[in-house]
Regions:
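Active-site neighborhoods and metal-handling regions in enzymes and metal-associated proteins
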Residues: 1-266
């Protein structure tokens, strides 16, 4: 395992890439409503990212099981946990939830963040799933400080979500991030206190709880990208890119614009 500690200059570049991801998610939030296709959202995202002089990292991202990813964002609706492919056939409906995962490459460094949006009015049980998943993200981030261990992050996410009876997906993880979108180490959403590698200042991590309302078992659709819950219950996904610091992690990405647009914090 090769982990790259970032310099302050590199962190500054990563901050710019991640701020662009946050701005892109906020721009997409303006378009999320019943009747909109996920293909439209993808076109909005790609234009917005390229207009800022950046590259949408996910476009043509390689797939060990099939064709490269064909779009600029992942649009995962309801029971799709991650990697949903934008399509003109996927039309948002009132009561849906959609997780939009976005990555940018700017000045040689990557940004990565995901937000699960409500489409119109959603049920109270789905609202709680979103709330708890987002809470677990920040509880995990609280553990991402120098001197703690990688397992402390996963333990915080897992214990919070499981007390509500939710499933914590095991096969998918967060990751290190920097010049490459996916670097070491993998950041699991489960674990035990004090386990795993020691966290050091300058590590940049994408922490991303992927939480299911029902069973944690998942499956791969024939498109070789979309991963769904086997029981077809909804899933939520929130992600921030952070840098490990002494005392308190620094969050490089941002939900501020998205939450301002929503008018409330989930």
């Amino acid at each position: 395992m090769q982990i790259f500690l970032k310099t302050e200059d590199e962190i500054n570049l990563m901050r710019k890439a991640n701020q662009l991801v946050g701005a892109t998610l906020a721009e997409l939030g303006k378009h999320i409503k019943p009747g909109v296709t996920t293909l439209h959202l993808d076109r909005v995202a790609e234009e917005f990212i390229r207009d800022q002089g950046a590259i949408p990292t996910f476009k043509n991202f390689p797939n060990p099981y099939g064709e490269p990813f064909p779009a600029s964002i992942c649009t995962s609706i309801n029971d799709v946990v991650v990697h949903g492919i934008p399509s003109e056939k996927d039309v948002l409906k009132d009561g849906d939830i959609i997780s939009i995962d976005c990555g940018t490459l700017l000045e040689g460094f990557n940004g990565d963040s995901c937000y699960t949006f409500a489409v119109g009015e959603i049920t109270s049980d789905v609202q709680q799933l979103l709330k708890v998943t987002k809470e677990s993200l920040y509880l995990g981030i609280e553990q991402a400080v120098a001197g703690k261990h990688l397992g402390d992050i996963g333990y915080a996410v897992q214990t919070h979500c499981q007390q509500y009876g939710y499933g914590v997906v095991r096969e998918l993880t967060g990751h290190g991030i920097g010049r490459a979108m996916h670097e070491d180490p993998p950041v699991r959403n489960y674990g035990s206190r004090g386990s795993g590698i020691l966290l050091k200042e300058g590590m940049c991590l994408a922490i991303e709880p992927m939480i299911t309302m029902g069973d944690r078992q998942i499956g791969l659709l024939p498109d070789k990208w979309s991963i769904v819950t086997r029981d077809r219950q909804p899933a939520a996904h929130f992600e921030h890119t952070i840098v490990v610091r002494k005392g308190k992690a620094e969050i490089l990405s941002s939900f501020v614009e998205v939450e301002h647009l929503e008018g409330q914090k989930i």
